[in-house]
Amino acid sequence: MTDTNEAQKPLLEVRNLQTHFFTEDGVVRAVDGVDITVYPGEVLGIVGESGCGKSVTSLSIMRLIGQPGKVVGGEILFDGKDLLKLPESEMMTVRGNRISMIFQQPQTSLNPVFRVGEQIGEVLNVHQDFGKEAAQKRTVELLKLVGIPDAERRAEAFPHELSGGMAQRVMIAMAPACLPDLLIAD
């Protein structure tokens, strides 16, 4: 039985998140003062028009904002720890294992030089200490779960050999591979 106080503890708390992009033309405040609270087992949808900061918010939570962007303010508390204060080595154990993300553009998220099965298997090897054979078996199971026909053969395909929809299914299969506590779908 779960303690009542434990059940009420947020899994994710984003407080006053501010992510800005520093360009030659000035500062773009892509995310400016976002607050989010997600409890275990809860589903939260963020909606808005194109360019309003939904993806930047998700990438900020994952600490995947690249230059010229930067999280300039706020807190991202995951299970009580501020992700913005974690060293990158510790963040790498959180990312993909405890928090996972389904990216919007599978063609740019999948590595074109590795077979899709290798990419899913790598996630399992790095975060869950699966052996090669166990990772291959689990990869095929995950591909089947997302409705990819002939999963054994598709695991051997390179990303460019898949349709856009099939590549998106690979991303959907990869994200929950390690049974994360939080899944972000962009």
Where are these regions (language model features)?
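Hydrophobic anchor residue at the start of the ABC signature
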Residues: 120, 172
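ABC ATPase NBD coupling module
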Residues: 83-100, 126
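Conserved ABC transporter NBD signature motif
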Residues: 71-82
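A short, proline-enriched helix->beta-strand linker immediately N-terminal to the Walker B motif
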Residues: 177-181
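Conserved ABC ATPase signature
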Residues: 157-162, 166
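Conserved ABC ATPase "signature" region
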Residues: 82, 134-153
